[in-house]
Amino acid sequence: MNVLSLFDGISCARVALDRANLKVDIYYASEIDKYAVAISKKNYPDITQLGDITKLRFEINQDKDSNLYSENMVGVGKFDIDLLIGGSPCQDLSIAKKNREGLHGKRSSLFYEFVRLRDELKPRFFILENVNSMSKENKQIITDVLGVEPIMINAALVSAQQRKRLFWIGRLVNDKYETVKINLPDDKGILLKDILEENVDEKYYI
């Protein structure tokens, strides 16, 4: 499976795919934070780092004489994506920010870069994640633009953290995206005391 992870951070999506026993052939990552990229490179040296999402360009080269064409990501070469994943910045969407600008904000408007690349690359599947606490208006805009319905999953079902997030999951069918419906995970009942370690190496302290 070929994966493109946008707003990749420290490549937690790669960790999740590995834990799900999904074979990853090629993993491309778009991330601009140098510290996050450094961690990703240390843990997964095989990941291809593409840099700033706003500078990623996809093009089709067509040979008019032979009707052959090739799909390329500028600077990378042939590009065939099975899964596009990403969680666009939420600072302008979350209720944690008082004067939030919604999808017009400088950071949260990067959602439209996700959409641009999805429409250019036509991946077989895509997953977009964002905060559940956004306004109904912004939630509906994202839903309408992506063309699929979201599902809300609380990380508390599988971890010791209350973290409600929306996931829009789409599958390409006849050149259009359809909603992929999934079941909520079972509640594992994990508490903070279940994951805290008593003896931790000092190198992990700041």
Model-derived features: positions:
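SAM cofactor-binding core of SAM-dependent methyltransferases
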Residues: 3-57
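A structural micro-motif
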Residues: 1, 24-25, 46-47, 123-124, ...
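Class I S-adenosyl-L-methionine
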Residues: 59-83, 88-206
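Exposed boundary/loop context
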Residues: 2-4, 79-80
